[in-house]
């Protein structure tokens, strides 16, 4: 590694099992650094880290730091994410011992400087677009390094250390840390107001994106997003699924169903070829086109790209089919923003009452089982949630997943139910008081041939996993 200020350091990750933290830990360990961590959970990422020889403490206790600092002293660096609170006992002990503490974004910024980096940012589609880029480059024999916010099917991991020149990484806008990154290519999928615990309005988010664009040598962005047109510089490389004239890269859909999307592909207004992708939905065409645009901007030949877009797979928890339970198909999805719900339901609707579907059997109804994520997001976007949930045939709401936030008075799933009914008075909608009651409610309110679409960024995925394990 070049420009390496951490060559003799030991990195200790507080909360190492998270999708972002575990990826960084994997890459550092495979590049020869000493790595340890702590996490209260026990998930597949923890097992993968242990397989790499990484020592993981089961509790986030002050004694972890005391034990490590006895051996490492000035060589020990503590890594945290924005999810780690200041009152965390392990972090408090690190401060007490005056240890060097870095945010995960500082580690990623360091890794980005080592390779030709393609950074994916935006409100929605980051993980899917990153996965597609990583898959294309992997299959095109580029052997990239990747740090992704989801499990990439091609590598069956959220991180991979390759021998090629490319590094693919997500640049998280949620806490503004993406302004630390100096990328070779910065890709922007879209931006709209979210993370209202950090951004007061859309203008503050746009200003952060503008800072990010100034740090990247090339910007590749989605022309179909009005906010990106405000945020991006004049020399932006644009892609679009709506128009091809005066656009650098375009894919205009010709056939779209629940099984495939066929589109006419253009470069700089000139028709090149048709492309077929196995990921239904306009948003997935957009994600795929963004990935193609990034690869082409990195001088990958289109002939090395096209053969691989027809067999793409989404990362885990992106419309992930889990199985069939009592005649009901189970799909798990990460959607937790109104726009993500809209796009996912639009995609699901393509699979209702048809055999042209990526699902194994035709479904009659879409049943959304939604776990709102964060009180602040629910409060600030409740009107949009209420509108977009109306595209389902039946809705079941769980309690709000706090993600570490304190409750906000009056912001509950019952409130979201009332707002949704005001927009959609004929929509069957139910709430459950506790997540453990959910299976019983699903059993009572749904029927055979329903598509059970579990949505949310919290622990709702555990319910879909539990039901899938009951499949005989």
Curated annotation (Swiss-Prot):
<dbReference type="Pfam" id="PF02875">
    <property type="entry name" value="Mur_ligase_C"/>
</dbReference>
<dbReference type="Pfam" id="PF08245">
    <property type="entry name" value="Mur_ligase_M"/>
</dbReference>
<comment type="pathway">
    <text>Cell wall biogenesis; peptidoglycan biosynthesis.</text>
</comment>
<keyword id="KW-0131">Cell cycle</keyword>
<dbReference type="GO" id="GO:0008360">
    <property type="term" value="P:regulation of cell shape"/>
</dbReference>
<dbReference type="InterPro" id="IPR013221">
    <property type="entry name" value="Mur_ligase_cen"/>
</dbReference>
<keyword id="KW-0547">Nucleotide-binding</keyword>
<comment type="similarity">
    <text>Belongs to the MurCDEF family.</text>
</comment>
<dbReference type="InterPro" id="IPR036615">
    <property type="entry name" value="Mur_ligase_C_dom_sf"/>
</dbReference>
<dbReference type="InterPro" id="IPR050061">
    <property type="entry name" value="MurCDEF_pg_biosynth"/>
</dbReference>
<dbReference type="GO" id="GO:0051301">
    <property type="term" value="P:cell division"/>
</dbReference>
<dbReference type="GO" id="GO:0071555">
    <property type="term" value="P:cell wall organization"/>
</dbReference>
<keyword id="KW-0132">Cell division</keyword>
<dbReference type="Pfam" id="PF01225">
    <property type="entry name" value="Mur_ligase"/>
</dbReference>
<dbReference type="GO" id="GO:0009252">
    <property type="term" value="P:peptidoglycan biosynthetic process"/>
</dbReference>
<keyword id="KW-0067">ATP-binding</keyword>
<dbReference type="GO" id="GO:0005737">
    <property type="term" value="C:cytoplasm"/>
</dbReference>
<dbReference type="InterPro" id="IPR036565">
    <property type="entry name" value="Mur-like_cat_sf"/>
</dbReference>
<dbReference type="InterPro" id="IPR000713">
    <property type="entry name" value="Mur_ligase_N"/>
</dbReference>
<keyword id="KW-0963">Cytoplasm</keyword>
<protein>
    <recommendedName>
        <fullName>UDP-N-acetylmuramate--L-alanine ligase</fullName>
        <ecNumber>6.3.2.8</ecNumber>
    </recommendedName>
</protein>
<dbReference type="InterPro" id="IPR005758">
    <property type="entry name" value="UDP-N-AcMur_Ala_ligase_MurC"/>
</dbReference>
<dbReference type="InterPro" id="IPR004101">
    <property type="entry name" value="Mur_ligase_C"/>
</dbReference>
<feature type="binding site">
    <location>
        <begin position="122"/>
        <end position="128"/>
    </location>
    <ligand>
        <name>ATP</name>
    </ligand>
</feature>
<dbReference type="GO" id="GO:0008763">
    <property type="term" value="F:UDP-N-acetylmuramate-L-alanine ligase activity"/>
</dbReference>
<comment type="function">
    <text>Cell wall formation.</text>
</comment>
<keyword id="KW-0436">Ligase</keyword>
<keyword id="KW-0133">Cell shape</keyword>
<keyword id="KW-0961">Cell wall biogenesis/degradation</keyword>
<dbReference type="GO" id="GO:0005524">
    <property type="term" value="F:ATP binding"/>
</dbReference>
<keyword id="KW-0573">Peptidoglycan synthesis</keyword>
